[in-house]
UniProtKB/Swiss-Prot annotation:
Pfam families: PolyA_pol, PolyA_pol_RNAbd. Its EC number is 2.7.7.72. Its cofactor is Mg(2+). It comes from Pseudomonas entomophila (strain L48). Keywords: ATP-binding, Magnesium, Metal-binding, Nucleotide-binding, Nucleotidyltransferase, RNA repair, RNA-binding, Transferase, tRNA processing. One of its GO terms (biological process) is tRNA 3'-terminal CCA addition. GO terms for molecular function: ATP binding; CCA tRNA nucleotidyltransferase activity; magnesium ion binding; tRNA binding. This is CCA-adding enzyme. It is an enzyme of class 2 (transferase). It comes from the Bacteria.
Amino acid sequence: MQIYKVGGAVRDRLLGRPVSDVDWLVVGATVEQMQAQGFRPVGADFPVFLHPKTGEEYALARTERKSGRGYGGFTFHASPDVTLEEDLIRRDLTINAMAEDEHGDLHDPYHGKTDLDQRILRHVSLAFAEDPLRVLRVARFAARYAPMGFRVADETLELMRQISASGELLALTAERSWKEIERALMEDQPQVFIEVLRACGALKELMPEVDALFHGEVSQGSHALDVLQQAAAQQQPLAVRWACLLLALGGKQIKTVNQRFKAPRECQELAILVGEFHEQGHRAMELAPEMLLDLLQKFDVYRRPQRFEEFIEACRMDALLGGRDYPQSEYLRGAAATARAVDVKPLMESGLTGQALGGALKAARLSALQAYKAR
């Protein structure tokens, strides 16, 4: 039995990046041998075990062959006869197909270290094209390592084009696709993820609405990527970044994209609201008090102040591209605070209830906003 550290832990150590999760590969062992040593099986599709003390994942060496469509369309074979080289060749990129033994020696049959040094994301074998999820993974890695100068190898990009043209991307589940999108959006240069998807034709398959933004007389797509990059530079949360990407789409299109990937509820809601109201955000100080109150009501600022704050931030990301200050931020925050400060208690004590109470509260808030605007 030989045990190797594999994948991201080896790659990131060689890059001098922090290593968070460590994956281990076991060659020459059986399921029974692993269990006899106290390892707990957790893999439903292939033998993966948790270490009895550290809780880290240990997988038996395995091979795989294509048996159906999509990410899950594979048959796996794990046995003590599977070699280290046979296991590593099934991996996506050469930089992820390196292993380190117990002595710290590097095992690199597919020249991942060379590609690492040359800053190239290159597929290990032609089997790369059998898994459509790898298109999203490579685009995500391109975004992650863009600050270090990495690029996708031409021949790998060509394979990604073939996958995109095959229709296999449409076999991916919403959950798997969203997981990659979410992780990519939270990288330092998430716009690179979209650029790579567009370069290989995957954006047209997965998000035709966003892809179409690049084909008008004025490229709204380039603007969307600039806003997304700005949001990342300002370390905005996921919901704001998602809203920035979709900002230029119409409400119906945003809803369609949201549902296609089953985005989290907070991401869906913010994207729709930002798409509909960001122009009002930019014109905040020109809005009549009635429109300003209506905007606050739409966002339910009384119960969900954080969502309105994220709306303000998305608007600010859009405006910052012009190098301008954004006084609308403080103006909108002040308006929300003014409306929230209206005390409902005196109205209730006066005996108002139901619709009458609601109408009086709205009138009081409008009066407060009129005074706020007049300052």
